[in-house]
Amino acid sequence: MQLSPVTLPTTAEEAMAVQDDLRARVVAANPRPPVFATVAGVDSAYDDAAGLVATAVVVLDTATLEPIESAVAHGPVRFPYVPGLLAFRELPTTLSALEQLRTTPDLLVCDAQGLAHPRRFGLACHVGVRTGLPTIGVAKNAWGAWTEPGRRRGDAAELVLDGEVVGLALRTRDDVKPVFVSVGHHIDLPTAREQVLALTPRYRQPETTRQADRLCRAALRAATGG
């Protein structure tokens, strides 16, 4: 994939202004019939002592959930930790890993928030806007208010922030804590829900996230000699 270089803001105020500017580009609708033959998971891991971040992208065949291709990138953390500005810590290595792919995935799934974010522009939105690809955020924790969905796989409850529905608390396993699904870019919420369920046949987390998590942790260990 060919992507334009990323220039990071230098302050939290500048970063929030970037989010506010790019938010208008998010499309919360399917741009075409939502048929996804390939899906890529994106996840990052940190070594705080070394000041490093490693990101992995794993492309799966949606029919089998078997890996087709993967890529990793690591580098120094170039932006401080500020709640709501996680994207600026992970975006450089995320885009670097995506650029290495020979396969352009039909869908991206980020272990992060999308519209379920204080400024409605989490990492999944940022990556989606930068790549132009349909993107979903699937987070382990929620921004916003939600009620417990039903106990069965597939049960969902709205995730609400400032009176606006920004995502779903989605049960992917019976009697297991839900994940929090939100639109990143070029997809609607019902389709995002459907795709996340397709990616969770056995575990709470999508298979995309599980495989990317393993790979980014291995890449970080290799980078730090751990």
From Swiss-Prot:
UniProt subcellular location: Cytoplasm
GO biological process, any: DNA repair
InterPro entries according to UniProt: Endonuclease-V (IPR007581)
UniProt keyword annotation of Translocase present: no
Pfam family, one: Endonuclease_5
Positions with a binding annotation for Mg(2+): 43, 111
EC number: 3.1.21.7
GO cellular component, one term: cytoplasm
Protein name, entry field: Endonuclease V
Organism encoding this protein: Nocardia farcinica (strain IFM 10152)
UniProt KW keywords: Cytoplasm, DNA damage, DNA repair, Endonuclease, Hydrolase, Magnesium, Metal-binding, Nuclease
Site entry: Interaction with target DNA: 81
GO molecular function terms attached to this record: deoxyribonuclease V activity; magnesium ion binding; RNA endonuclease activity, producing 5'-phosphomonoesters; single-stranded RNA binding
Reaction it catalyzes: Endonucleolytic cleavage at apurinic or apyrimidinic sites to products with a 5'-phosphate
Broad EC category: hydrolase
Family: Belongs to the endonuclease V family.
Gene3D superfamilies tied to this protein: archaeoglobus fulgidus dsm 4304 superfamily
PANTHER family (alphabetical): ENDONUCLEASE V (PTHR28511:SF1)
Keyword DNA repair included in the entry's annotation: yes
Known role: DNA repair enzyme involved in the repair of deaminated bases. Selectively cleaves double-stranded DNA at the second phosphodiester bond 3' to a deoxyinosine leaving behind the intact lesion on the nicked DNA.
Cofactor: Mg(2+)
